[in-house]
From Swiss-Prot:
Residues 57-97 form a coiled coil. The keyword Ligase does not apply. Component of the biogenesis of lysosome-related organelles complex-1 (BLOC-1) involved in endosomal cargo sorting. Component of the biogenesis of lysosome-related organelles complex-1 (BLOC-1). This is Biogenesis of lysosome-related organelles complex 1 subunit BLI1. The keyword Coiled coil applies. GO terms for biological process: endosome organization; regulation of protein localization. Belongs to the BLI1 family. Signal peptide: none annotated. It is found in: Endosome. Its main location: other.
Length: 116
């Protein structure tokens, strides 16, 4: 029985050792890939930093406020457009009603003059 326990213990230790080797190898690969990407990104950042300048936070805030103002003005303009579209619809309807009333009045007058 003692011999079986020793063999089992040795087998478990061997499995643990192989598992640890695998984990260490994969960790080293992942660290190497990560380090390579960090270095690559650092070089790319240095390259584009020369091409593009970053805006100051105050300037970015000014742009944000300007954008908000323009959005508000657009909203107001859209409201005015909707108002004038409704007004146009009402004026078109009013014009149609006036035209109908004018025709009715014309017919009434012509009947009146024909009867006289």
């Amino acid at each position: 029985m003692r011999e079986q326990e020793r063999k089992l213990s040795n087998g478990i230790e061997h499995c643990l050792s192989k598992t640890q080797e695998y984990v260490d190898m994969e960790s080293a690969k992942a660290i190497s890939i990560f380090s390579s990407k960090v270095n690559s990104n650092g070089r790319w950042l240095a390259e584009i930093s020369g091409k593009y300048e970053l805006k100051e936070s105050g300037e970015l805030e000014a742009f944000r406020l300007l954008k908000e103002d323009h959005v508000k003005m657009l909203d107001q303009l859209e409201g005015k457009i909707e108002y004038y579209e409704k007004l146009l619809d009402e004026l078109t309807e009013f014009t149609s009603e006036i035209e109908i009333k004018r025709k009715i009045e014309k017919n009434r007058r012509s009947r009146h003059f024909n009867n006289v």
